[in-house]
Design a protein with these regions (language model features):
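Short glycine/proline- and aromatic-enriched beta-strand/turn motifs that initiate or cap beta-hairpins
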Residues: 20-86, 184, 190, 213, ...
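Outer-membrane beta-barrel strand-turn architecture
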Residues: 22, 62-66, 109-115, 147-151, ...
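Transmembrane beta-strand segments that form the barrel wall of outer-membrane beta-barrel proteins
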Residues: 32-34, 117-127, 153-163, 175, ...
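Extracellular loop and loop/strand-boundary signature of outer-membrane beta-barrel proteins
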Residues: 42-46, 87-93, 126-131, 142, ...
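Hydrophobic, lipid-facing positions within transmembrane beta-strands of outer-membrane proteins
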Residues: 52-58, 99-105, 121-125, 139-143, ...
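Repeated loop/turn-to-beta-strand initiation elements of outer-membrane beta-barrel proteins
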Residues: 66-72, 113-119, 151-157, 184-188, ...
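Outer membrane beta-barrel transmembrane domains
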Residues: 91-93, 188, 202-204, 208-280
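Outer-membrane beta-barrel "beta-signal"
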Residues: 174-184, 246-256, 283-299
Length: 299
């Protein structure tokens, strides 16, 4: 399971649409998750791999009103790859444990009675354990506006601009939407904890006052700097896929969310590149099952 979908799930849990708006003042948020990607085969090249992922984050926001806020969030986690057999990417394991550390600022402000703006700059380090942080850092910016067209429907455009390791800056459009289709059905994009690269799309159904079921999907691409003592010294690893998960979320009170998810990753590909970003080898991998749990606590 990759960072961007996982952080999007956390962002969904923490979004104003799902958590009750607190009174003006300071708001503390703690969040975390664990996910497991089951072992899957690496295409025609042979070999297989599995993945375990954990993440913890902490945020502090000051709210002047439900539409005006400024905050900071910090977080970190680890993706533990476990390769088996000859992968075709490298003579041994192409990489091991991947660390992720990030900090982001979140600014939300009203433009007029119906339009709200949001700006989220971020700084991130993605590296294999032992790799240099100075060669593994990237920056990003998410910005957008949302129009409240009517009760239960908010929509608007946005843009994401993200630096990439040894590659050109990536720019992509974003659709911001929060649509109450009925009293129980909702279609929305989460804000994405830690400024993940573009929000995913989630359809939810409020089964009871405390339980919500959902379906979430997004495109994923994660790049990370490799250690100097591996098969690709100082190079770049990439994991690219399209995850789709079903979620079941329990909310015992307005400030607490616990979510369980299960699904699969489709169209996966791993890539190993040298220190300048030139591709050394690639390998597709079969559809992989994934499952896990996430929580958000807000005070």
């Amino acid at each position: 399971m990759k960072l961007r979908l996982l952080t999007a799930l956390l962002g969904l849990l923490a979004s104003p649409a799902l958590l009750a708006q607190p009174a003006p003042g300071w708001v503390l948020t703690a969040e975390g998750l664990y996910a497991h990607q089951a072992e899957t085969d690496l295409g025609d090249e042979g070999g297989e791999f599995s993945l375990d992922r954990w993440y913890l984050g902490l945020g502090l926001d000051y709210l002047w009103s439900p539409r005006t806020a400024l905050g900071v969030s910090v977080g970190g986690g680890e993706s533990r790859y476990d390769f088996g057999g000859l992968t075709g990417l490298a003579p041994g394991e192409p990489w091991g444990d991947i660390e992720d550390w990030n900090v982001s600022l979140v600014s939300r402000f009203p433009i007029n009675d119906r339009i709200t703006g949001i700006v989220v700059p971020s700084y991130r380090v993605n590296r294999e354990s032992g790799a240099s942080s100075s060669n593994a850092d990237t920056w990003g910016l998410l910005a957008g506006v949302s129009w409240r067209l009517r009760e239960g429907l908010t929509i608007g455009p946005g843009v994401g601009v993200f630096d990439r390791i040894e590659e050109s800056t990536q720019v992509f459009p974003i659709l911001v939407i929060d649509w109450d289709i009925t009293e129980r059905w909702n279609l929305s994009t989460g804000r994405g904890l830690a400024a993940s690269q573009g929000p995913g799309l989630t359809l939810t159904y409020a089964a009871t006052d405390n339980w919500t079921l959902g379906l979430a999907g997004r495109y994923e691409q994660v790049d990370f700097r490799l250690a100097e003592d591996g098969p690709g010294p100082g190079g770049i690893g990439r994991d690219e896929t399209f995850p789709l998960v079903g979620t079941a979320e329990w909310s015992p009170n307005p400030g607490t969310r616990l979510s369980f998810f299960v699904g699969a990753e489709f169209g996966g590909e791993l890539e190993l590149a040298d220190a300048q970003g030139n591709t050394i080898a690639t390998s597709d991998y079969d559809t992989a099952m994934l499952f896990g749990a996430a929580f958000v606590w807000r005070y």
